[in-house]
């Protein structure tokens, strides 16, 4: 239930942040929140750990924000004429991740005696890569 609440609130919270600082800096902040949340979860994964729960909620908060931010980003980059179709293609990444992520995480855990930490660290790296790619995109966009 807490994850659902955080996800729902994330759409509103990150939308307000985006209105203040812009879409792309908000995406960077969300990737940072995902990395931080996953780090808390990986480091404090003991049952009932408040910090692990906070980490999961940070990730859920950001997932809601990504879903709220991507339609505007899609329209900005490819126009509004086909935004529904284009957003559908962008959103497909969530579907692929929903299928592949748990399977890959489970395989990593199996090879590490049931410990999911390696899966968390890989996704933290992916979130940090997201920040780098977003910064690269911003720098290229300003030059164009």
Segments predicted by a language model, with ranges:
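Cytoplasmic membrane-interface "Motif A"-like loop-to-helix N-cap segments
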Residues: 20-31
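Hydrophobic core of transmembrane alpha-helices in multi-pass small-molecule transporters
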Residues: 51-65
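Residue-level signature of mid-helix packing/kink "hotspots" within the transmembrane helices
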Residues: 4-12, 95-99
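Multi-pass alpha-helical transporter architecture, strongest
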Residues: 124-144
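Paired intracellular helix-loop junctions of major facilitator superfamily
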Residues: 75-83, 113
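Interfacial helix-cap and linker-helix signal at transmembrane-aqueous boundaries
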Residues: 17-18, 104-113
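C-terminal ends and interior cores of transmembrane alpha-helices
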Residues: 32-46
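Intracellular juxtamembrane helix-capping segments at the cytosolic ends
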Residues: 65-78
